[in-house]
Swiss-Prot record:
Mode of membrane association: Single-pass type II membrane protein
Post-translational modification: N-glycosylated.
Keywords, in A-Z order: Cell membrane, Disulfide bond, Glycoprotein, Membrane, Signal-anchor, Transmembrane, Transmembrane helix
Assembly and oligomerization: Homodimer (in vitro). Interacts with KCND2. Identified in a complex with KCND2 and KCNIP2. Forms an octameric complex composed of four DPP6 subunits bound to the KCND2 tetramer. Interacts with KCND3; this interaction modulates the channel gating kinetics namely channel activation and inactivation kinetics and rate of recovery from inactivation.
Record region (Disordered): 1-25
Gene behind the chain: Dpp6
Claim: Metal-binding is one of the keywords in the record: no
Disruption phenotype: Knockdown animals obtained using siRNA technology have smaller brains than their wild-type littermates. Performance on the standard Morris water maze indicated spatial memory defects and learning disabilities.
Cellular localization per UniProt: Cell membrane
PANTHER family the record matches: DIPEPTIDYL AMINOPEPTIDASE-LIKE PROTEIN 6, PROTEASE FAMILY S9B,C DIPEPTIDYL-PEPTIDASE IV-RELATED
Name assigned to this protein: A-type potassium channel modulatory protein DPP6
Extracellular side, ranges: 56-804
Length: 804
């Protein structure tokens, strides 16, 4: 056996017979000087090593432990409140914005002079929620005691006040005092304004003049004039406003939406009275009667003459939606008509003096037509307009690009030409500069998860230039607006850094000044353990799918973290972006050491129409495959605890999270420990007609797609996993009926579920207190699910069963 002699326990072998000592018997003299030099050298080397370690260690690592973790309280605190100045251009050089302290300011870009139009204390004294300045800057319109109706719509009281210190004057219809209005807003000129009361439209030529009722056919809850009903607000126009001023203010286009044949839905109110009450409203479900719509134009100078714009004479348009209205000139209005199946659209230019509409462009799809409510941009004479349409770009299908349509004098034919092309999307056209022959737009040309501001020449070579690339630090996701002559632009950086707003010269991109830096939010972020964000791609069949991973700030490869998959997946949506966000997911990562992953799979937007429309008539099926591939990719990482994996989704994402929860892993074992769904869609025949029919076809013609996508077919496998369902009982978008139907199936399948309800609350949780409670509930559920104690690794459990 080999033995090793330690330095402190020397083993000495005595000399045997016949062996001679090779050294003398006198002990050697020690070299004390050499030893001292050696020790000094060692000390110098050690000090150099220590110094190097200190210098090379990142400062953030040494200070990380001193930083606070993000909490639920942070989400709703002033420290984390992003201030949006809501800047709006009103001329070639001037814009109006609201400063952080509340005052409304007029600022001149060239002189850098600022004028206070409205003191913040005046807004506070009126308890005003919204304000709007008249075009002549003489008056301000305030709204207060505002109550939400649906996602965008609201009712409230309105007052007018002369700038800067005038007394407030109530805005009311002639026949009613102290009226709660559905809408009020200025026109494009002077002090002209309209307001809507009981679905009728009233017009004031200027402040002080009595309002006149110009549209009188309204019927509360049934016939809407100038406003959207529920379906148009939520799914079609995506706005509560359904009226449009001509540029010169002489005419008003408005939609009349008739819900008289649409079935009624009743939302119960359980609290506040001995017997529950109900709120009825018209809600078209898949296959039921839809609202009818017509577009009218009224003249505002002289006698009001009401003229209806004629829809296309096309058999495919027997039932249609109006998805976009935009004035081209003071007498021409552009309208997009979309058939109920949402696979044929016709863009027309209507004469506001005759009602005759001329077809300018037609689009058709074998699946569905996406992005149908986007407005074209017109030249001043209306002969040329720019619009976004899907153009084939090779194997990845179609991408959305700018097309220009030019009409020639004395000719019925228009010239169509593409301005942009490539495997990326134009996400929005912003402005057209006729003087410089440039079009300004946002696009994903850099990366699908980014948004940058570009310009393109509209003549000759169509050369493009990125205006926002490398313009502002830590800013890759932007939006923008231009002054009236396009000499200046406001750049709103929305991420990945803390949002900022800056003002730039268009010619040389020079930054003129910072309008909002959100410095307090930046300080709060710097003081917190914010998640590390990583981006990856996974290969699924013929697609390369983007993935976003949020890791704790203190992440190390040697630890084991629970994994949460967050799904949205609404067709055309995007989860993986570089926008700045601080949400309950941030809290789960920062305070509770979870890893969160998101993946934009088939059905998501901004990666071509081929990937987008793969999910047609089979919602859930392909999304499950892609999301599970993202989970499998993460489970290959050593730092992920395979016994603590969860999934969460909201709305359509709630449908997907419930669909995915029973999914099996590669060894046919359960992948997910738990899951949660907030306001889940569970049966598409119970959901809004425009949404369900867009992706599954018209209900009643072929219902197989509706039957196949029911969650009832999936939840029978939910036995062991913890499952939390959260739903508001007065949800006007996804009715509690969805959850009730799901629970019936869960009980039959003996599933382990929990239900949390919010009595009498709407879909959008307008109350801050309820939003905070909701965040705590979701976080608390996953923290409990991820607890390590009493958890037995799956492999160990199986081995013990085999031994028994």
């Amino acid at each position: 056996m080999n033995q090793t002699a330690g330095a402190s326990n020397n083993v000495r072998c005595p000399p045997g017979k016949g062996h001679k000592e090779l050294v003398g018997s006198n002990p050697p003299q020690r070299n004390w000087k050499g030893i001292a030099i050696a020790l000094l050298v060692i000390l110098v080397i050690c000090s150099l090593i220590v110094t190097s370690v200190i210098l090379l260690t990142p400062a953030e690592d040494t200070s990380l432990s001193q930083k606070k973790k993000v909490t639920v309280e942070d989400l709703f605190s002033e420290d984390f409140k992003i201030h949006d100045p809501e800047a709006k251009w009103i001329s070639n050089k001037e814009f109006i914005y609201r400063e952080r302290k509340g005052s409304v300011i007029l600022r001149n870009v060239e002189t850098n002079n600022s004028t206070v139009l409205i003191e913040g204390k005046k807004i506070e004294s009126l308890r005003a929620i919204r304000y709007e300045i008249s075009p002549d800057k003489e008056y301000v319109l305030f709204s207060y005691n505002v109550e939400p109706v649906y996602q965008h719509s609201h009712t409230g009281y309105y007052v007018l006040s002369k700038i800067p210190h005038g007394d407030p004057q109530s805005l009311d219809p002639p026949e009613v005092s102290n009226a709660k209005l559905q809408y009020a807003g200025w026109g494009p000129k002077g002090q002209q304004l309209i307001f809507i009361f009981e679905n009728n439209i009233y017009y004031c030529a200027h402040v002080g003049k009595q309002a006149i009722r110009v549209v009188s056919t309204g019927k509360e809850g049934v016939i809407y004039n100038g406003l959207s009903d529920w379906l148009y607000e939520e799914e079609i126009l995506k706005s509560h406003i359904a009226h449009w001023w001509s540029p010169d203010g002489t005419r008003l286009a408005y939609a009349t939406i008739n819900d008289s044949r649409v079935p009624l839905m009743e939302l119960p109110t359980y609290t506040g009275s001995v017997y529950p009450t109900v709120k009825p409203y018209h809600y078209p479900k898949a296959g039921s009667e839809n609202p009818s719509i017509s577009l009218h134009v009224i003249g505002l100078n002289g006698p009001t003459h009401d003229l209806e714009m004629m829809p296309p004479d096309d058999p495919r348009m027997r039932e249609y939606y109006i998805t976009m209205v935009k004035w081209a000139t003071s007498t021409k209005v552009a309208v997009t008509w979309l058939n109920r199946a949402q696979n044929v659209s016709i863009l027309t230019l209507c004469d506001a003096t005759t009602g005759v509409c001329t077809k300018k462009h037609e689009d058709e799809s074998e699946a569905w037509l996406h992005r149908q409510n986007e407005e074209p941009v017109f030249s001043k004479d209306g002969r040329k307009f720019f619009f976004v349409r899907a153009i084939p770009q090779g194997g990845r299908g179609k991408f959305y690009h700018i097309t220009v349509s030019s009409s020639q004098p004395n000719s019925s034919n228009d010239n169509i030409q593409s301005i942009t092309s490539g495997d990326w999307d134009v996400t929005k056209i912003l402005s057209y500069d006729e003087k410089r022959n440039k079009i300004y737009f946002l696009s994903t040309e850099d990366l699908p998860r980014r948004r940058h501001l570009y310009s393109a020449n509209t003549v000759d070579d169509f050369n493009r230039q990125c205006l926002s690339c490398d313009l502002v630090e830590n800013c890759t996701y932007v939006s923008a607006s231009f002054s009236h002559n396009m000499d200046f632009f406001l750049l709103k950086c929305e991420g990945p850094g803390v949002p900022t707003v800056t003002v730039h010269n268009t010619t040389d991109k020079r930054r003129m000044f910072d309008l909002e830096a959100n410095e307090e939010v930046q300080k709060a972020i710097n003081d917190r353990q914010m998640p590390k964000i990583e981006y990856r791609k996974i290969e699924v069949e013929d697609y390369s799918l983007p993935m976003q991973i949020l890791k704790p700030a203190t992440f190390t490869d040697t630890a084991h973290y629970p994994l949460l998959l967050v799904v949205d997946g609404t067709p055309g949506s995007q989860s993986v972006t570089e926008r700045f966000e601080v949400t309950w997911e941030t809290v789960l990562v920062s305070s509770h050491g979870a890893v969160v992953v998101k993946c934009d799979g088939r059905g998501s937007g901004f990666q071509g129409t081929k990937l987008l429309q793969e999910v047609r008539r089979r919602l859930g099926f392909l999304e499950e495959k892609d999301q599970m591939e993202a989970v499998r990719t993460m489970l290959k990482e050593q730092y992920i605890d395979k016994t603590r994996v969860a999934v969460f989704g909201k709305d359509y994402g709630g449908y997907l999270s419930t669909y995915i929860l029973p999914a099996k892993g590669e060894n046919q074992g359960q992948t997910f420990t738990c899951g949660s769904a907030l306001s889940p869609i569970t049966d598409f025949k119970l959901y809004a007609s425009a949404f369900s029919e867009r992706y599954l076809g018209l209900h009643g013609l072929d219902n197989r797609a509706y039957e196949m996508t029911k969650l009832a077919h999936r939840v029978s496998a939910l036995e062991d996993q913890q499952f939390l369902i959260i739903h508001a009982t007065a949800d006007e978008k996804i009715h509690f009926q969805h959850t009730a139907e799901l629970i019936t199936q869960l009980i039959k399948g003996k599933a382990n579920y929990s239900l949390q309800i919010y009595p009498d609350e709407s879909h959008y949780f307008h109350s801050v207190a309820l939003k905070q409670h909701l965040s705590r509930s979701i976080i608390g559920f996953f923290v409990e699910c991820f607890r390590v104690q009493d958890k037995l690794p799956t492999a160990t459990a199986k081995e013990e069963e085999e031994e028994d």
